[in-house]
Design a protein with these regions (language model features):
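Bacterial N-terminal signal peptides
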Residues: 2-14
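Flexible coil/turn and secondary-structure edge motifs
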Residues: 18-195
């Protein structure tokens, strides 16, 4: 019985330690299906959830999301991947020079954005944005905001790239996302044409 108690205590300690290394990031990068798909490929990402953030409407939905942007809440293991590494991936999977949306998706809900959950994330996001100035031949228009309420998208949007792979790939290719990302970032584009 004593050994069982010790083992349970050790396992509980490991669970608490693991929980402390789990962190959250929120990125808006146009269509949340694509953002979710890209970050699901990153080692150390534990979960991605598509949703809406940045607006004021309560209980946002796809049909009624007000001034929210499509975004993805990312849970990651900071022992495996850092927030700075996620920022690197984010920038290189979007067109941060597009002030009208992303790729074929136009309008406010498809604008890019970084939603910082604390001052450390805000500082890292600003530094990563500053490091890109002058690299792409146009101003970086992606905004950095303090995180606000995040409303999970409807169930059919979650893991869309897995549940509806053919439709998703047709959409992604037709929208020109990978072609534009490859044009902007070249060899630095981690997932262009990798779907």
């Amino acid at each position: 019985m004593r050994i069982l108690t010790v083992l349970l205590a050790l396992m509980a300690g490991a669970t608490v330690a693991k929980a402390e290394t789990l962190q959250t990031a929120i990125f808006a990068g146009g269509c949340f299906w694509c953002v979710e798909s890209d970050f699901d490929k990153v080692e150390g990402v534990v979960e991605t959830v598509s949703g809406y953030t940045g607006g004021t409407l309560q209980n946002a939905t796809y049909r009624n999301h007000g001034e929210h942007r499509e975004a993805v809440r990312i849970t990651f293991d900071a022992d495996i991947v850092s927030y700075d590494q996620l920022l690197y991936v984010f920038w290189r999977t979007v067109d941060p020079t597009d002030a009208g949306g992303q790729f074929c998706d136009r309008g406010h809900s498809y604008l890019t954005g970084i939603f910082a959950l604390n001052e450390a994330q805000a500082t890292a996001a600003r530094a990563s944005k500053d490091a890109l100035r002058g690299r792409l031949g146009a101003p970086i228009v992606t905004e950095i905001f303090p995180a606000s309420d995040f409303w999970d998208a409807e169930t059919y949007h979650q893991n869309y790239h897995q549940k509806n792979a053919n439709r998703y790939n047709y959409y992604r290719t037709g929208c020109g996302r990978d072609a534009r990302v490859a044009q902007l970032w070249g060899d630095e584009a981690p997932f262009a044409n990798n779907h």
